[in-house]
């Protein structure tokens, strides 16, 4: 028979787990690939002439044993969180990417000829007692480069949730751009429809464990640039301390993707682009806001930005004179001030505008990608339960 103190302890532990509700993943902010190149005095276009952009998944062949994906902006993001794989735990820094659905990390079997593998944490299946081989070949392509690997199964722990997960061990990882990346791999937070090789995505496996109070996850990026703490991802809900007001929800516009209808893009409250509507995706895997080349060209010309070595730039002294740029989603308008969408690197007099051009052909495009530049201003809730995305103003 339980003693009274044992009963109280048992109930307390149960309540601790069942207020489950929120499982938190701390995000660290580090220099993006773009910023790393900038610090070295290089531009993206200098080292990646054929790699201006990527876009995720092809609609055909996703469930074949060997399938491919095209990466957008080569995961040029600043925000990474930690997960573990295997028993005992092997730790990896990953990008939580709403634009894809697979988990991949470098493999211990990756040849030392690939310097990008050597410079990152690598998964060693021989060190894990819970590893199970699968072997299915996986290829992820971007521009003229590629990542090659094979599927394995092991225990993956995200926040405090352990799941049995198929993931890709990358054995061919190109030096450019991954040599400049501060993350080890990518954890896709997209829908199963986007998954390469028919793999069940990590978040779907977490949902099947029924440990979350709601089948949602939220993404918060801190606005405080001086802090190394980049924000957090919350599984199972959202944290009111990260936002003000209420969430406003927009239903996803395409089954199986985090796409929403974009009713217009305006400059100083005047609709300038997407008069007849466009499609946008909220992309946690990229830093900039991207759109069709013709639209971005008009937008940049309107604010006086010019193209220089692959990036749009403007005189830093003009930042305070630039107009707000707004995105119309659902019944709401989400505005970005110039201090948000213009980036200043070190002591340069020329500043980078955080917009880039990307032409995605039909049927997947044309498409706007709202990356970290947008997410820093607005706390985002991705709701799998109701197939919708919520937006609230971040603190």
Curated annotation (Swiss-Prot):
Gene Ontology molecular function, alphabetical: aspartic-type endopeptidase activity
Enzyme Commission designation: 3.4.23.15
Places the protein is found: Secreted
Principal localisation: secreted
One Pfam family hit: A1_Propeptide
Carbohydrate-modified residues: 64
Domain (Peptidase A1): residue spans on this chain: 79-392
Coiled coil: none
Family named by the database record: Belongs to the peptidase A1 family.
PANTHER family with a match to the protein in the record: BETA-SITE APP-CLEAVING ENZYME, ISOFORM A-RELATED (PTHR47966), RENIN (PTHR47966:SF24)
Name of the protein described by the UniProt record: Renin
């Amino acid at each position: 028979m339980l003693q009274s103190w044992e009963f109280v302890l048992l109930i307390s532990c149960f309540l601790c787990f069942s207020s489950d509700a929120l499982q938190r993943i701390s995000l660290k902010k580090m220099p993006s690939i773009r910023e790393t190149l900038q610090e070295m005095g290089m531009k993206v276009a200098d080292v990646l002439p054929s790699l201006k952009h990527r876009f995720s998944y092809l609609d055909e062949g996703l469930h074949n044993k060997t399938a491919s994906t095209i990466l957008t902006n080569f995961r040029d993001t600043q925000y990474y969180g930690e997960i573990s794989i295997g028993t005992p735990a092997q730790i990896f820094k990953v990008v939580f990417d709403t634009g894809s659905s697979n988990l991949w990390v470098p493999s211990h079997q990756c040849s030392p000829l690939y310097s990008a593998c050597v410079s990152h944490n690598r998964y060693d299946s021989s060190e894990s007692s819970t590893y199970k081989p699968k072997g299915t070949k996986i290829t992820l392509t971007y521009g003229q480069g590629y990542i090659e690997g094979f599927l394995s199964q092991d225990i993956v722990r995200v926040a405090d949730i352990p799941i049995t997960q198929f993931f890709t061990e990358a054995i061919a990882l190109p030096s450019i751009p991954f040599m400049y990346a501060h993350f080890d791999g990518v954890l896709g937070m997209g829908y199963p429809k986007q998954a390469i090789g028919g793999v069940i995505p990590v978040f779907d496996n977490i949902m099947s464990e029924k440990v979350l109070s709601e089948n949602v996850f939220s993404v918060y990026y801190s606005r405080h640039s001086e802090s190394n703490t980049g924000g957090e991802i919350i599984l199972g809900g959202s944290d009111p301390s990260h936002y003000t007001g209420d969430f406003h929800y927009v239903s996803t516009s395409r089954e199986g993707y985090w796409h929403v209808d974009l009713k217009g893009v305006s400059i100083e409250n005047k609709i300038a682009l997407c008069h007849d509507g466009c499609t946008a995706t909220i992309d946690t895997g990229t830093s900039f806001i991207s759109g069709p080349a013709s639209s971005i060209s008009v937008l940049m010309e309107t604010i006086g930005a010019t193209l220089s070595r692959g990036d749009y730039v403007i005189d830093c002294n003009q930042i305070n004179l630039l107009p707000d740029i707004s995105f119309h989603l659902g019944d709401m308008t989400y505005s970005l001030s110039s201090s948000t969408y213009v980036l200043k690197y070190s002591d340069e007099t020329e500043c980078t505008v955080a917009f880039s051009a990307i032409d995605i052909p039909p049927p997947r495009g044309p498409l706007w990608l709202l990356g970290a530049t947008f997410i820093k201003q607005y706390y985002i809730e991705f709701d799998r339960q109701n197939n919708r995305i919520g937006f609230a103003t971040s603190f």
